Amino acid sequence: FDVGLPQPYRIEGDAVTQRQRFVAELNKETAKQGSYTAAYQTVVDKVAYTWFNRLIAVRYMEVNDLLPSRTRVLSSADGRAEPQIVTSPFDAVLDYTPAEQQQIVTLKNDNKLDEAFRLLFLKQCAALGDCLPRLFEQVDDYMPLLLALSFTDKDGVVCHLVNDIPESDWQDAVQIVGWLYQYYN
């Protein structure tokens, strides 16, 4: 899948361990179901459902000013393309470690804004686990590896959530959440 890229795609650091755990999960599920294809579908569905739930919840919470951090994660209140959490990551009190702070600064300085965004989204989800533990429970450690999240991709889910659905529609939680779940399924 990396045909045409200047260098082959490679993973390093934590992603190596996450991949190993993903393979172990697939093997465990294959043994349980007796079929790699069925196991793969089960694991992919679990991952997709988890991230879908979290994206919808975060979008609802940010539009209705319900995020404890009071910082928008997927959008900005002033209409900028760059989410508020990327513009001002340290306004959100998310208990950053010194290494995370440095990583965020480095990613921003290197103009790797989608990578910073992904890191910040994961950090926000982890923080929400304290107040909404059932929705934002700690994920299996391979799941972040499978989260391809971008705010710059015009065809990406974040762009569509922010730009295709008016914020006023997010005011009626039952209707918008029900519609999205119906569409998802």
Each model region followed by its residue ranges:
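Preference for the N-terminal adenyl/adenosyl cofactor-binding alpha/beta module
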Residues: 1-185
